[in-house]
């Protein structure tokens, strides 16, 4: 976690007191004020297994008893602390008294039923996440997962090897919850996506497909990359090749990755750190969003030295590529939204917009030509997950970089003391999805803007002005007279340092820790823009 920029402090409950400390008042934990709670359980904590040949109804009853116990803890923790919670599913014992029949009648069968029920339970509780202990135990191997000597002497539920595996996986999940997952995978080509060098070996000399073990390993790696792309990870190429040779390699009949799979292709002989900086500029993303994969250690060393915020992975040998990238956990997700599934198409549409802009002599004429339409409306349940995701991963156009849980998004939406707005922008090139959020806390005649953010994909389209106009209208309807905006500087959000000034706010106070701005709504007039706004009540969109 330290390597990913997190320096946590910990509260640890007494041994085997997880239920009591979760379900009842816990002053020490309340004073600690956790941002995240981890409930570590295993199959050893299962209170009661069904008897052999127990009827289906009895098994179902025991499953429900375990789920009721877990739900009591979850509800209590969510009510008292309003933070994210991680809970394990159940691993398997290292022994099977029924042998292979255990999967049909014994403990294995019951644990599988518990894990299925747990998935259903967690889906009913926002901001609760599952650590897949069942998978981790299989990854280590059950014979190595449980150390009977450690258990009987020290009550360790797993071996040291198992503990290390859990700790690493827990750090990946924690980083994902707090918005630290990466967004872009930058790939070299020669001897990374395929074997060989296209400029020297030609198309026929490239190693890819099923003709050899090496060829199969490269094909498998490309299939894995496509899986990442399909769930929203952006792909880019950074290769020392001519652009023509890069496209030639991607045209190979066994190549699974095609030019259309990449949000950006940089194939030239510039230093790779400069190309990566250019990719970041074109995609409007910070360098800390990138993972760089290259078989050449010299290129990896260059990028690590020049761009320390870029994650650089030692990818190993071709047969290790998938394992090393997967186990690094850079792209760990906590949810999947429609925006994730459409992300590559959205960035490709952005490229079309950039090309179209060159045809206009004035930027205003370009904006008018986009035929932009936006829904700017209060939060609603269908989009809670996307809103939490956007809040937790937006760093640059974000005035406060306040993070939240899914439960907090739900609370804001339902509270009469909050104004919530989201912005979804569409134009003639496509749907950008939900790309802007504002959250204001009402205090008398003042609305404090705790969150104001926007995706960098829609910079310079004036959506922020449309959002401000809608917010001001809603605030006036609630008899609010003053908006207060807050800017808390970070290494990444300098682009919004003057946002409230540009909105017409007056600077009230300024310190190293942040600035406070104020807007008198009685004097405020709407900002002009080129967006047709729907407040969510009209079907004309």
Language-model regions, residue ranges each:
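Short hydrophobic/aromatic-enriched beta-strand-loop microsegments
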Residues: 9, 259-264, 310-317
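Substrate-recognition element of Asp-dependent hydrolases with the DxDx(T/V) motif
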Residues: 220-251, 266, 399-404, 408-409, ...
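Basic, amphipathic juxtamembrane/active-site segments
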Residues: 199-223, 308-315
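Extracellular glycan-modifying ectodomains
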Residues: 1-186, 193-194, 199-200, 204-205, ...
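Acyl-donor binding region in acyl/amide transferases
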Residues: 425-428, 434-510
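Terminal substrate-recognition subdomain of acyl/acetyltransferases
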Residues: 282, 304, 308-370, 473-541
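Conserved Lys-Pro-Asp/Glu-containing loop-to-beta segment of HAD-superfamily phosphomonoesterases
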Residues: 276-297, 303
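A conserved beta-strand-loop-helix scaffold within acyl/acetyltransferase catalytic domains
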Residues: 375-454
